[in-house]
Amino acid sequence: MANKREFPLAKTRNIGIMAHIDAGKTTTTERILYYTGKIHKIGETHEGDSQMDWMDEEKERGITITSAATTAQWKDYRINIIDTPGHVDFTIEVERSLRVLDGAVTVLDAQAGVEPQTENVWRQAETYGVPRIVFVNKMDKIGADFDKSVKSLHERLNANAHAVQMPIGSADTFEGVIDLINMVADIYDEDKLGSKWDTVPIPDQYKEEAEKRRGELIEAVADVDDGIMEKYLGGEEISNDELKAAIRKATLNLEFFPVYAGSAFKNKGVQMMLDGVIDYLPSPLDVKPYVAHDPKTGDEVELMADDKKPFAALAFKIATDPFVGRLTFIRVYTGSLESGSYVLNASKNSRERVGRLLQMHANSRTEIPEVFSGDIAGAIGLKNTTTGDSLTDPDHPLILESLKVPDPVIQVSVEPKSKADRDKMDVALQKLTEEDPTFRAETNPETGQTLISGMGELHLDIMVERMRREFNVDAKIGEPQVAYRETFTKEAEAQGKFVRQSGGKGQYGDVWIDFTPNEEGKGYEFEDAIVGGVVPREFIPSVDQGLQEAMKNGVLAGYPLIDVKAKLYDGSYHEVDSSEAAFKVAASLALKNAASKAGAVILEPIMKVQVTTPEEYLGDVMGSITARRGTMEGMEDRAGAKVINSFVPLSEMFGYATTLRSSTQGRGTFTMVFDHYSPTPKSIQADIIKKRGGEAE
């Protein structure tokens, strides 16, 4: 092997920082980079110069959009940090980063505790089995409540989370933390930007409380660790090392979540949380074997981090970098790869050459000769690779599980101002859809109008802004429209028969198809139940294809038909006149004929909406949610305000920000997250069909 790895695998951590928007995640990441010596000047998100937020749009909006991958060093460990966005419109970025992480730090706002997007990212982390520690940030804020934040983890996430620290003071008096494992106090020097603190005995006024909390921590660990339980019940002393080892084991098994306190903005507590990353989060050697598939045999193959095994990596993000052009972020699972060598893109079965390999720091980069298992790096030169592709040793192809991409829920029309803008827009849309699989662009063949769709208004705003800024496209943007869907609610059988005789060769296709509703989210499923060759083998794929094409345009109002099973069970053919095209048309006719019997309905996206308002405006806010066809899910108190949880159709949420602002004198805030699709009420369905007039035949 030409090069040696710089850090052993056991001393490597691949982590993500996850949070609700505004919980202080970017500031926390900044501080990590500052204390690990990667940056020399601290950037503040709210002043727009944070190191991690490297796209112009992020600098302007003060939110994190793209998961920049950064390498840092703490003590003698390498920590690769993937900065994930906290805004719900960028959920795919969070999914992508979780897919390649080994562990995560969940950042909470000490005043708010668990918020809606925290629930979302926590659930995603559960899906991918990512161990987490929690950092309760903003302890310097008025209303900061560490204990309430820990409680919210239990109540809202059902998480077995326990404090391994206790804050000293809060709001203006927050000056440090008490370590409940080593039973010492870390008190910060205000003048040293957090780079200096004193570890001292626990101040007398906190001793009793600290002893009580350590006892509670030991009890909580005993519940998930038999060895600690035995010692605890036997009244034996439990050493700090034993306690730490038990917490590590339980955290790696997703049975325990250690909680830290701090204020990234005020430079307190970040280093102790970094110690937590090392102490409790996994190295690539600690995670479960990674399951891949052999494309030749279909067999499952388990991958463990090992430099000697054949190379296998996942491309988890494509970015257009101003300096190097197309940059592919990869996570290496096994083996190693030198720059200049060839890899097989096993997902597309094509060879690609990796020109250069880069180690990324927020917005600068270092060229490296080789990457090893467990590494996260940027590759230049991969022309055909897209998000979710598997890159492997050409002699050992493997398919790693790809990413689940959610469907967009909102769309707008984009009209270029001139012919030159049209050409630039085509290039821009191709690049942007490559980078972000939840962003789609399509042109209506009849009207020539281009529609872009995405995960929310902010998502589309940012994409349009990027078209203007990066590709110099001047375009007119239409009103946002809801991405409705259609589905069947009843079983229906129908025949589709297409016969055309007009001199010369005719056309003949005849099918009987049984349509049944599928489970929500299962999509379209096709079953071939033909017996005795009544529809010849070679025409069956055409029936499947004909159905899929027809479903794109729905049966009621031109919206895609989803979650339907189709079983082809009978039909007939003509020796001479039958063709693939004829069976395609026959299938689409069967779908059309089934529509009236299958209880077709239009589905609309329902958003989970959380509104925070001062109590005096509660009546108005609740009235306005009800008026928007919202259903209440519950209410809670938070820092002197009321928090209303509800479900509201997306179509009713346009312009809500303005309504809320005026009805609460600018003091109310809201967040919304896509939750599920639901049938529209009959009157609204009729309106939609009428508006789309003519598209539904």
Curated annotation (Swiss-Prot):
Disulfide pattern: none
Domain of life: Bacteria
GO molecular function terms noted in the UniProt entry: GTP binding; GTPase activity; translation elongation factor activity
Domain tr-type G: 10-285
GO BP: any one term: ribosome disassembly
Compartment(s) where it occurs, according to its Swiss-Prot or TrEMBL record: Cytoplasm
Principal subcellular localization: cytoplasm
Any one cellular-component term (Gene Ontology): cytoplasm
Claim: Lyase is one of the keywords in the record: no
Amino-acid positions noted as binding GTP in the UniProt annotation, renumbered to this chain: 19-26, 83-87, 137-140
Entry keyword set: Cytoplasm, Elongation factor, GTP-binding, Nucleotide-binding, Protein biosynthesis
Pfam families tied to this protein: EF-G_D2 (PF22042), EFG_C (PF00679), EFG_III (PF14492), EFG_IV (PF03764), GTP_EFTU (PF00009)
Entry annotated with the keyword Cell division: no
Function: Catalyzes the GTP-dependent ribosomal translocation step during translation elongation. During this step, the ribosome changes from the pre-translocational (PRE) to the post-translocational (POST) state as the newly formed A-site-bound peptidyl-tRNA and P-site-bound deacylated tRNA move to the P and E sites, respectively. Catalyzes the coordinated movement of the two tRNA molecules, the mRNA and conformational changes in the ribosome.
Family of this protein: Belongs to the TRAFAC class translation factor GTPase superfamily. Classic translation factor GTPase family. EF-G/EF-2 subfamily.
Protein name as catalogued: Elongation factor G
Encoding gene per record: fusA
